Amino acid sequence: MSRIGKKPISVPSGVTATVEGQLVKAKGPKGELSYIVNDEVLVKFEGNVISVSPRDQSKDARSKWGMSRSMIENIFCGVKNGFEKKLEINGVGYRAALQGKDVQLSLGFSHDVIYKVPPGITVTVPKPTEIVISGIDKQQVGQVAAEIREYRRPEPYKGKGVKHADECIFRKEGKKK
């Protein structure tokens, strides 16, 4: 039995939710999101509480039960508060700057990397070595952060590269003479 899936989801204040078959819609102060729940999972909306349960006891239905509950909770949290990821840039001459809506990254290549920000995502650069990505869709915010990090992953010897603010880089010692 899923420990996450069996918890009911209460709709936060300021958010309106509708359930139409397998489609869950949420509208809040930050915007509107929807999620199509897998056919293996049942969604019930009673009062101000949404409960999720598997249609049958098959392994496939039970494996998607907890994930469906988490996804529904994430859309409620996203339309109410939004999500944010911070990236840090370490390295001599490594920096970021906004160029219109796009992000210009100087990461030691012979050319600057221009990252086109998808719609629904806001990117700010408070310092040249810090990038803040925010939006209402948790998956999309994480995807943008991962794509920017992928241009120059942190290396283990000097720690140069783009890393998440809360990420700890395992450092290695150089060759001994």
Swiss-Prot record:
RNA-binding recorded as keyword: yes
Supply one GO molecular-function term. Answer: rRNA binding
Q: Report quaternary structure and partners.
A: Part of the 50S ribosomal subunit.
rRNA-binding as a keyword of this entry, yes or no, is yes
NCBIfam families per UniProt: L6_bact
Q: What does this protein do?
A: This protein binds to the 23S rRNA, and is important in its secondary structure. It is located near the subunit interface in the base of the L7/L12 stalk, and near the tRNA binding site of the peptidyltransferase center.
Q: Which PANTHER family match?
A: 60S/50S RIBOSOMAL PROTEIN L6/L9, LARGE RIBOSOMAL SUBUNIT PROTEIN UL6M
**This protein's name:** Large ribosomal subunit protein uL6
Its gene is rplF
